[in-house]
C-alpha cells in the first residue's frame, strides 16, 4: 500500500466513525428507538449505509434491535462505558475534592449536566457547625446554581437555548430571568467561573468552575451559607481555579483552548 492509499484509508475510517457518532446521537435523542428509515432521514445518509453501520454497532452492543416491531435504540455497552467513565472521574477527582474542602472548610461537590439539571456525582460535606449538606445523586436545576451555569456555558448556543427552554422556573427573589442568565453565561464562558447568590435557595450560595477533561465536562463547586460568601468569594475563586488547573493537569484536558 502506498502513502496515497493509506491516506484514503484513514479518511474513510474517520468518515465511518463520524457517521456512526451521528447515528448514535440521533438514537440518543429518541430513547424509545427509531426505524432505519427514520435514522437515515435524521442523519442524511442512504438507508443501506445506515444499515451497515447499525450492524457493526449492534455487534459491539452499542446499538440493539427493538424486536419484532423493528427499529433500534442505544445498546447496553454504551451505559457500561458511561459508568466506567464516571467511576474513573470519581476516583481521580476525590483527592482534590478533599483538599479543596479542607482548605476552604466548606462543602464541595463534583457534578455533571443531565438535561436542564445537574447531577451531583460526589461531594465532601463541611464539618463546620453552620454548613450546607446535600446528598450524592441529587438533581438540582442547572440555571439557578453555579455548578449548572459553568456546564450550561460550555454548551453550543443551539443546545443551550434548548436546555433553557422558553421560561425558567423562579425559586427565590434572586433567581435570574432568562435574558439576564444568558448574558451571565456569556461572561462565564470567558472566565470559566460562576456564582449563585441565593438564586436557588435563600441563605445558600455557591461558586463553581468548569472541569474540561478527556472524560467530559464536569463542574467543581463550593456550596456554603450566604452569611460567609461575600467575605470569601475572592479566596474561593482562587482556590477553585487552582484546583481546576491541578485536576486538568492530572487527568488531561479534552480541548486545548481554555473555556
UniProtKB/Swiss-Prot annotation:
Residues 36-59 bind DNA. Residues 14-76 form the HTH iclR-type domain. Residues 89-253 form the IclR-ED domain. InterPro entries: GAF-like_dom_sf, HTH_MetabolicPath_Reg, Tscrpt_reg_IclR_C, Tscrpt_reg_IclR_N, WH-like_DNA-bd_sf, WH_DNA-bd_sf. SUPFAM superfamilies: GAF domain-like (SSF55781), Winged helix' DNA-binding domain (SSF46785). GO terms for biological process: negative regulation of DNA-templated transcription. One of its GO terms (molecular function) is DNA binding. It holds the Pfam family IclR_C. Keywords: DNA-binding, Repressor, Transcription, Transcription regulation. In conjunction with SrpR represses the srpABC operon. This is HTH-type transcriptional regulator SrpS. The lineage of its organism: Bacteria, Pseudomonadati, Pseudomonadota, Gammaproteobacteria, Pseudomonadales. The gene is srpS.
Amino acid at each position: 500500500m502506498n502513502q496515497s492509499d493509506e491516506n484514503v484509508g484513514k479518511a474513510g475510517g474517520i468518515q465511518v466513525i463520524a457517521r456512526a457518532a451521528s447515528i448514535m446521537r440521533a438514537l440518543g435523542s429518541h430513547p424509545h428507538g427509531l426505524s432505519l428509515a427514520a435514522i437515515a432521514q435524521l442523519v442524511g445518509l442512504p438507508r443501506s449505509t445506515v444499515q451497515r453501520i447499525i450492524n457493526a454497532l449492534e455487534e459491539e452492543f452499542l446499538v440493539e434491535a427493538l424486536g419484532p416491531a423493528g427499529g433500534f435504540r442505544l445498546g447496553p455497552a454504551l451505559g457500561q462505558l458511561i459508568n466506567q467513565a464516571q467511576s474513573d472521574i470519581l476516583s481521580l477527582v476525590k483527592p482534590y475534592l478533599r483538599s479543596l474542602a479542607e482548605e476552604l472548610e466548606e462543602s464541595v461537590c463534583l457534578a455533571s449536566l443531565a438535561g436542564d439539571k445537574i447531577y451531583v456525582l460526589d461531594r465532601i460535606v463541611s464539618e463546620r457547625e453552620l454548613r450546607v449538606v446535600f446528598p450524592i445523586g441529587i438533581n438540582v436545576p442547572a440555571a439557578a446554581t453555579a455548578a449548572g451555569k459553568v456546564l450550561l456555558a460550555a454548551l453550543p448556543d443551539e443546545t443551550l437555548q434548548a436546555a433553557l427552554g422558553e421560561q425558567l422556573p423562579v425559586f427565590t427573589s434572586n433567581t435570574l430571568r432568562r435574558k439576564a442568565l444568558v448574558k451571565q453565561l456569556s461572561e462565564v464562558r470567558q472566565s470559566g467561573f460562576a456564582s449563585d447568590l441565593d438564586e436557588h435557595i435563600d441563605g445558600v450560595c455557591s461558586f463553581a468552575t468548569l472541569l474540561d477533561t478527556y472524560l467530559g465536562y464536569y463542574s467543581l463547586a463550593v456550596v456554603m451559607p450566604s452569611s460567609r460568601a461575600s467575605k470569601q468569594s475572592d479566596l474561593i475563586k482562587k482556590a477553585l481555579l487552582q484546583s481546576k488547573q491541578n485536576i486538568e493537569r492530572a487527568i488531561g484536558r479534552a480541548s486545548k483552548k481554555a473555556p
